[in-house]
């Protein structure tokens, strides 16, 4: 079972709002997920990112693979650097 950290779309037509979720890669985009770790709202200017750092780092440590888009979000928020080079 491959675990991914990915975006699940919500919101109205033409006004997307995304939940950052941990899910099995075989599940549908907006289907079943294991845990919700944050949100992403691209409609705001600038875009709003709300991620729970502890949960995200925990899942990355367990081997969950972020999608390319989520990886870019993690870099913008600063979580990816904490995962790649943990404080000694």
Swiss-Prot record:
GO molecular function term, any single one: structural constituent of ribosome
Cellular compartments per GO CC: cytoplasm; small ribosomal subunit
UniProt keyword annotations, A-Z: Ribonucleoprotein, Ribosomal protein
GO biological process: translation
Domain of life (superkingdom): Bacteria
Family designation: Belongs to the bacterial ribosomal protein bS16 family.
HAMAP family: Ribosomal_bS16
Protein name as annotated: Small ribosomal subunit protein bS16
Species this protein is from: Citrifermentans bemidjiense (strain ATCC BAA-1014 / DSM 16622 / JCM 12645 / Bem) (Geobacter bemidjiensis)
